[in-house]
């Protein structure tokens, strides 16, 4: 009996019937940076063995289904804008004055040459709807193991999502291919208070199959429930707005 108790204390606990709790945790993580609506200023730093580049962006969100991100610098990329409405996504390139709709097959493609995908940027994939969830917990963290449902088209065979319990904050996501090989990691860093909410102020995306590559998004400012964000902020007309 004593030996059994020691084993239970030393190893994480797989919580039976915990899918609803896992869904609630994932939903809370996905709402961290959004709220009902939000405005955000971000810097994205892309590093490769050959070069490094930095982009500054302004973004707005409305609920889970609306998002727009506009590059404000450097000058050569200024005005490039990405719009997401429901499951549709468009990019606007002001230099050629052209709107290009992103097909579903390209959602896992790189956004602006970074290690983040189009899907990462606009969060089109709904984890709680498209993945089966298994919750493992210990005294300090939740580990949620996500595997795609039978009818889900996914680049990932599995996602391990590690979340700190107190305060409830994301720590890391590990992405595996269909063969069980870990191919990238998303690490959350440097928690700060924005609009009264504590959340990570930086996210590092590390592609493990591309040595020397790293993309970091820094959140410079976040405002929740800002005035002026409405349905019309996410129109195709707004997408083509020049700055």
Located regions from the model:
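Extended lipid/amphipathic-ligand handling interfaces
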Residues: 29, 57-61, 188-193
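Flexible, processing/modification-adjacent segments and terminal tails
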Residues: 18-37, 43, 53, 86-157, ...
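Solvent-exposed coil/turn segments that connect beta secondary-structure elements
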Residues: 45, 62-64, 72-74, 87-88, ...
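Gly/Pro-enriched, hydrophobic low-complexity segments
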Residues: 122, 141-234
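Generic beta-strand structural signal
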Residues: 61-62, 83-85, 92, 135-138, ...
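Short hydrophobic/aromatic-rich beta-strand segments that constitute the beta-sheet cores
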Residues: 40, 67-71, 89-93, 99-101, ...
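Sec-dependent N-terminal signal peptides
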Residues: 4-15
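N-terminal, post-signal-peptide region of Sec/Tat-exported proteins
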Residues: 40-76, 168
């Amino acid at each position: 009996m004593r030996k059994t108790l020691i084993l239970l204390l030393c190893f994480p606990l797989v919580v039976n019937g915990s899918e609803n709790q896992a869904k609630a945790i994932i939903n809370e993580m996905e709402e961290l940076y959004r709220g009902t609506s939000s405005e955000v200023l971000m810097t994205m730093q892309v590093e490769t063995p050959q070069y490094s580049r930095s982009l500054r962006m302004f973004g707005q969100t409305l609920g889970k289904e609306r998002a727009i991100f506009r590059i404000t610098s450097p000058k050569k990329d200024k005005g490039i804008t990405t719009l997401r409405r429901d499951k549709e996504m468009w990019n606007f390139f002001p230099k050629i004055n052209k709107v290009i709709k992103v097909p579903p097959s390209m959602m896992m493609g790189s956004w602006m040459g970074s290690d983040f995908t189009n899907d990462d940027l606009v969060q089109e994939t709904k984890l709680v709807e498209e993945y089966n969830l298994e919750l493992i917990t210990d005294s300090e963290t939740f580990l949620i193991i996500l595997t795609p449902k039978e009818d889900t088209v996914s680049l990932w065979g599995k996602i391990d999502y590690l979340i700190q319990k107190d305060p409830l904050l994301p720590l890391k996501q590990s992405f595996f291919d269909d063969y069980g090989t870990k191919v990238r990691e998303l690490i959350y860093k440097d928690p700060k208070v924005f609009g009264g909410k504590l959340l990570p102020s930086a996210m590092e995306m590390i592609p493990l199959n591309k040595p020397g590559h790293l993309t970091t998004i820094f959140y410079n400012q976040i405002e929740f429930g800002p005035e002026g964000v409405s349905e019309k902020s996410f129109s195709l007309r707004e997408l083509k707005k020049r700055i």
